Amino acid sequence: IPSAQPKSDNPIHAKKVEGEISDDPNAPVWKDAQASYISLGCQLEAKPKSYFPTVRNLTVRAAHNSKEIALYIHWDDPSLDPTLKKFTAVEESPPPPLPDHFKGLEPDEPHEPVIPEYPDAIAVQFPVNLDTHKPYFLNGDADHPVNLWKWTTATNKAIEINAYGLEGWTAQEGSTVSVKSHFRFGRYSLILR
């Protein structure tokens, strides 16, 4: 375990590749692409606020060819959103074995997972205009709009949004953004393209 968190990387560098970009997170293209560490914080801008996030960082790798850019994003999350099980295979860590004297009675009915009020989600923000002014980090603003690629466990789909601040956004018509997601032993992995 590192004694300190890695330095957050800004900007993210995309590896140039020939041909199709694999959506397999174990493919060589992702092992060769530079990893960028991104620190995350609390969500204090809009209600309901989140003072104590369960996810504190994520890692991004990017690759591009002459047709598209793809992002491999992964993060550790101790609390799987059970909705994802409707859409893709999920591998959860088994509970640790307990000595007999710590075991309780088996429940009469199976335990139903609790569906969270807010599903797990991630959004990647791109500036619409490549001027020298960076857009506001949360959905840009009226003068500096952004394009968002957003994924959520509620649908396990990616959508594309044009945002002009916290209150102003519209779905991108003709969006071609796609996602392949995985959850394995406490780690979400996505390939957005």
What are these regions (language model features)?
Residues 1-193:
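Structural preference for beta-rich elements and adjacent junctions enriched in aromatics
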